[in-house]
Amino acid sequence: MFKKPLIFVCMTVIVFLLICGCAAKQEASLPRLIIGCNNYEPYYYADADGEPAGMDVDLAKEACARMGYVPVFRQINWNERDAALESGEVDCLWSCLTMDVLPDDYAWVGPYMRSRQVVAVLEDSPIHTLSDLTGKRVAVRTGSKAEKLFLEMTGENIPQVGKVYSQNQTDEIATALRNGYVDAIAGYAATVRKVLQKENVQYRFIDEELSHAAFGIAFLKDSKTAVRDALSETLSEMLADGTTASILKRYGVDTAKALGGLAGE
């Protein structure tokens, strides 16, 4: 009586296992692209299951799938990223890396998107312009573009702030703002927005921007051009067919600002 259903179930399981086995073998035969990453939400972070997630992760997965590669995300000490590249620990750096900061240090692929450096304050703050930051306390992430801007005053509109507090994690600067330890925080718009919402901080951006940044993927200068060329072509295709915009929109990014003027748009 139960023989036929049992046979059907067994056959279904066998077919499923065969399909999974074939898929695993096929993936195992594909070349790997080992990607060096830095924890910088929402570009790269670990999700609730500890798996890599974020805008850069989603873009890399899509690009690698089209190229016939398997992406391997490896979180590294970002201060030692050059050593990781040179030793072969990673093939490239793909983690909201700004091309204009180190334009000649790497073989670049991109830009694949742009971002804005912004300043956030508490909703009821008297700070409304960059000049209002003069003499104030500003928190930034250690090693970030915002840190460089305030410490070196490398822009015409950068004021002389009273103190720059550098923190290792973005949530630490959000906590500093919420608790009144600093008057403002600065960083990439998507990152600042994400962490302040996550920490439930009532905030606003001041109207003036600190700067714009173009993100790219960094390879060693003597790395294989075939991989770089294939990745560059694939990212252009993703931009042209709307895939990049679709991915960024899932993270609340203003795609008109993030992708406007890039090749393929």
Where do the PLM segments sit?
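C-terminal motif of bacterial Sec signal peptides marking the signal peptidase cleavage site
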Residues: L18-G21
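Beta->alpha turn/N-cap motifs
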Residues: G36-E41, R74-N79, G88-D100, E123, ...
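Flexible hinge/capping segments at coil-to-helix
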Residues: V121-V138
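Periplasmic-binding protein-like
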Residues: N38-N39, R114-V121, Q197-S236, D254-E265
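Ligand-binding cleft/hinge of the Venus flytrap
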Residues: A46-A48, A60-Y69, A146-Q167, L196-N200, ...
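A ligand-binding cleft/hinge motif common to bilobed small-molecule-binding domains
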Residues: E80-A83, S95-D105, L149-E152, A176-H212
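Extracytoplasmic small-molecule ligand-binding "clamshell" domains
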Residues: E27-L97, S166, A230, R250
